[in-house]
């Protein structure tokens, strides 16, 4: 274990484009973020390409890049990562699919993706639904596993996914779903059939009856996507000599942590939404550094606000992240003496589009070892997309930035 501590903070999907509603500023530029600004001023700021060419802009690809793993070498699909975090061991013939509980709106005989989260269905409600699927649709070939809120898992044995095309439901908000239904291979018909059977079950499910009676959106369909086989990747200890932890409410981020050999810490009250337990994430993160070198703290709220298309919620999520996560961590790190901290989102999530986009993201960071150097051309008065771009510091891969981070942002 090193005495020097390394911390990465990830406000998922925080990066965005200028908005007329905010006077031409991005949400990050508009929000009050004194703690993140102080990091940019004390160290460096720049851009990093978290999404390699040819990869879809998702949190799986983004977090893998941030942690120093090249997705082009190690990524096999989103769902195997989520399976790992859920303790589901995949065999060599198993394919994992993400199963979203969603709300589909039918209008004039056409179906639209109305809500990718099934009205932010609760975990307890969702467990009841997944248990029904397990009893009525499950077996040795199709295995259903409950996750958190709307995010669940289906494992299918002996299915050909070569050429199978699926799309994330949060990337098709309010769009007609016909052209996005799983397709591209003979086996896609099996996947579509499971979706149809699940939809039939959900029509009269007791959970949905209660939600409708309470004026809530029903989870009236499922959406299968993110398929893949079990990946093979070196641990963080093997690749970079670090031992540490990951803290997130999101299964795929936990799964990356597991494959990286990091300890996955479950924080009570971590919801993956704006009501998450920010203080708990900081508390558990700082405690983890007593026995480790490194911690990755991931917060989903900024991403969820963007998917909902709500500027006010995104501003709140950014300011909450700055106050409770960035501020809390900077205070907590003081007791460790020497440390290096970096802050960056995993990808853009444009609140106007309600979906992820692949632009290079802004990062900022500083190290107690190097912050007292003479004024640095990569420092900035605050942390924003524009100033990060203007700094001229750019990394075309996560592994390059991660090594720079481990070198304490040493420019020598």
Which residues are covered by each model-predicted region?
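Feature captures the catalytic ectodomains and active-site-proximal regions of enzymes
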Residues: 1-412
């Amino acid at each position: 274990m090193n005495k020097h501590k390394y911390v990465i903070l990830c406000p998922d999907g925080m990066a965005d484009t200028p908005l007329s509603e905010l006077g031409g500023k991005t949400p990050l530029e508009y929000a009050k973020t004194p703690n993140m600004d102080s990091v940019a001023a004390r160290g460096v700021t720049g851009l990093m390409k978290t999404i390699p060419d040819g990869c879809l802009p998702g949190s799986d690809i983004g977090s893998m890049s941030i942690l120093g793993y090249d997705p082009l070498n190690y990524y096999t699909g989103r769902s195997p990562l989520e399976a790992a975090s859920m303790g589901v061991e995949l065999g060599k013939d198993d394919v994992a699919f993400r199963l979203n509980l969603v709300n589909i709106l039918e209008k004039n005989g056409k179906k639209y993706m109305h809500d990718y989260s099934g009205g932010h269905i609760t975990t307890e409600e969702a467990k009841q639904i997944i248990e029904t699927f397990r009893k009525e649709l499950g077996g040795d070939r199709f295995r259903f596993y409950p996750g958190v809120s709307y995010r669940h898992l289906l494992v299918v044995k002996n299915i050909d996914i070569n050429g199978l095309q699926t799309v994330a439901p949060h990337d098709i908000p309010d769009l007609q779903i016909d052209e996005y239904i799983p397709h591209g291979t003979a086996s896609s018909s099996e996947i579509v059939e499971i979706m149809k059977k699940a939809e039939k079950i959900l029509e009269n499910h007791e959970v949905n009856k209660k939600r409708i009676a309470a004026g809530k959106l029903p989870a009236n369909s499922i959406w299968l996507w993110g398929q893949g086989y079990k990946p093979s990747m070196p641990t963080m200890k093997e690749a970079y000599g670090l031992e540490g932890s990951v803290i997130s409410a999101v299964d795929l981020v936990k799964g990356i942590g597991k494959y990286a050999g990091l300890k996955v810490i479950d924080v009570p009250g971590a919801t993956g939404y704006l009501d998450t337990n920010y203080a708990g994430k900081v508390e558990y993160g700082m405690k983890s550094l007593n026995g480790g070198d490194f911690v990755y703290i991931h917060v989903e709220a900024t991403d969820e606000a963007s998917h909902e298309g709500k500027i006010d919620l995104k501003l709140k999520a950014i300011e909450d992240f700055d106050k409770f996560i960035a501020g809390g961590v900077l205070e907590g790190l003081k007791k460790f003496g020497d440390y290096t901290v970096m802050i960056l989102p995993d990808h853009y999530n444009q609140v106007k589009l309600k979906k992820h986009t692949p632009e290079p993201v802004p990062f900022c960071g500083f190290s107690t070892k190097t912050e007292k150097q003479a004024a640095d051309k990569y420092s900035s008065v605050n942390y924003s997309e524009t100033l990060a771009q203007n700094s001229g510091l750019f990394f075309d891969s996560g592994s390059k930035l991660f090594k720079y981070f481990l070198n304490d942002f040493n420019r020598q």
